[in-house]
Amino acid sequence: MTGLVGENFRRDGGVIPATITKNLNKSSGRQRAREKMADKEFFLSLLSSAATKRDAKAYLSRFPSVKKPKPPIPRQNQGAVETQSGKENEKPGVNLGSFYGATRSVLETPVFRQGPAPETETAHAIGLDEALHVALVKLANAQSLDDETIQGVALTLAQLTRLGMASCVVVDPGPMQDETTWRKAAAEQADRLSAAIDACDGGKARRLDSVLVKNKDRDLPKIISRQVLLRPLRNNHIVVVTPVAYSEETCKASSVPSSDAMLALTRELAGLERKHDPDEDPRVTAEIFAALQKEVAVDRLIVLDSVGGIPAFKGPQQSHVFVNMEQEFKDIEAELHEAMASIERFVDPSAESDITEAATKSNPISKFVATEVTPLSTGQQKPLIEANGGLMTSTLKGHIENLRLLQQTLTLLPPSSSAIITTPRDVANSARPHQDVLSVSQVGTRRQKNPLIHNLLTDKPVYSSSLPSERRGQTAPSIAPSTFLKRGMPLTILPDPRITPWSPNSPDGHHLTLDDPRIDLPRLVHLIEDSFNRKLDVQDYLSRVNGRLAGLIIAGEYEGGAILTWETPPDIPEQDRHKPENISRLVPYLDKFAVLKRSQGAGGVADIVFNAMVRTCLPGGVCWRSRMDNPVNKWYFERSRGTWKLNGSNWAMFWTTPRVPEEDPLKFRDYEAVCRSIQPSWADKKAVVD
């Protein structure tokens, strides 16, 4: 018989002191409070990441939370079974359906889409997508990070796991004097991160020390066992790997570069390390390879490095927000090497004749020289430049290493995979509980976006790469913003601005026509008609633009593009447009900006084309017009420097030219006159609606 006995109570034949039950109740209450607080912080992180409803649908289609059917469980054992094994085996996830219906500003984030947003196709995803979604993370210079930063990084990794993204982290302790010290530091930092993960609510770490092996016949290490990696990842553990490899011949341990460890993990999880039998049926080989790729999806490559995102030394931008690797990798790599060489030149003693003059001509250090060096005497300048020159050179080497690593890894992965470089401090600051971020005297504002959570939900950078810097608002107080990278797509630009800059008196530009054999005119016409959902009068359009083309930009296989022209203001006779006094008044005009419907709102195609237009082709500015009811206008508005409604018409005019109309009213009048005068070339001849 069960009943109270004095201050004790009897349960299942035993007597438990009442004091113990009180302590158990208090402990469970504290646990529930901790879980409630963790849930609150988790959802605050999601909300502050500001994903749109469309992004939420896309996330849910990639990371469906599907429960597998289970055999019926006897009623008497059902509760016990669920208690013991439910949490361990369930797929992590979160119901975001109604969560994203709350914020108007979130729902109205502009996306380049010229038609109604299609419903997200989730039929394939529901129940069919059983791939393990993995993020490979490189934590650089872990020894230099304080405990608070490590804890913030650990919390974010735990939140990624909860959102369905398993993480495998390579811990790089940083530069060390010798091999033994380096391996010891690597183990210590791996333990430090593992302990921080275990301390998070729901966080579980699994440290792997013997996962890498090295063969004398190849430089790159490989993974000793695929299942050693996959088992803990499937059980919702965050795998922590030390970049130490063991020799297959001698079993001797040696350090390997963390970038090599990341490459080895990428190759293994991408299914590229399977030994190929030359006698095997090719169809069997293809089936096995496809099965390996379906088993694991390496969705993200994450580099957490104190040097931050990739800086930009050319153009108005200070950093690369988005990198289209197919188009930009070689140029950015050369840009970083050029910056490093410029530092080394003026640090060299042979350049000391006029150190300040040489330095101020070099973009990467001009600010430092202007503020710190120039005010000093000549004798004081050189030691300061030498000391900081070494630091800047080391930082640039870090940027080059990160860029090369992501280029090599993204090449091995599907085009849908992406990468992000950000600082551990930015991740940690945005992961901290909200009340810790504000002091008593501060005013509460919107919580800082967590770059990793935002990137997972949206597969985009924190802000669009084609936004002018003044429209990006106040971002994190970091000197090195995040960089988002994708394999992307190649760009075809005619004429090539690196060889012949686009100019109204450029001979190449005058002779370029849309009949050029380098241009696939039928595909270009299809791109325009698909994007605008209108039939083009091709011959009328060709007769209008041929002879005045500034250039053409094509993204990928005609997935997006822009046609730009040099237009003549109406008060200049057409036959006089090329006279020297009139050339300066020719208007750079965006005649067509088109993206295939299937590529609108995703993949960054519109941003890739727009960036090429305003940064590479026409950095001095360009104007265009758009119907007043065009849903793309919000997207245009954010990327332009000005907009103007053309009274008496259904047109709005946009431009990216600086200081217009304030300092150049004539140019503004020419822009307006051109935008009013151009006649459309649609086959339906419905110019009235325009």
Swiss-Prot record:
Residue stretches making up the N-acetyltransferase domain: 508-679
GO MF terms held by the record: L-glutamate N-acetyltransferase activity
Catalytic activity as recorded in UniProt: L-glutamate + acetyl-CoA = N-acetyl-L-glutamate + CoA + H(+)
Entry's Gene Ontology cellular component terms: mitochondrial matrix
Enzyme Commission number(s) from the entry: 2.3.1.1
Disulfide-bond pairs as recorded: none
Spans through the membrane: none
Keywords, ordered alphabetically: Acyltransferase, Amino-acid biosynthesis, Mitochondrion, Transferase, Transit peptide
Species of provenance: Talaromyces stipitatus (strain ATCC 10500 / CBS 375.48 / QM 6759 / NRRL 1006) (Penicillium stipitatum)
GO biological process, alphabetically ordered: L-arginine biosynthetic process; ornithine biosynthetic process
InterPro entries hit by this protein: AceGlu_kinase-like_sf, GlcNAc_Synth_fun, Vertebrate-like_GNAT_dom
Superkingdom of origin: Eukaryota
A Pfam family it matches: NAT
Region (Disordered): 62-93
Residue stretches of biased makeup (Polar residues): 75-84
Protein's recorded name: Amino-acid acetyltransferase, mitochondrial
Cellular localisation: Mitochondrion
Pathways involved: Amino-acid biosynthesis; L-arginine biosynthesis; N(2)-acetyl-L-ornithine from L-glutamate: step 1/4
Function: N-acetylglutamate synthase involved in arginine biosynthesis.
Major site of localization recorded for this protein: mitochondrion
Family, as annotated: Belongs to the acetyltransferase family.
Keyword Transit peptide: yes
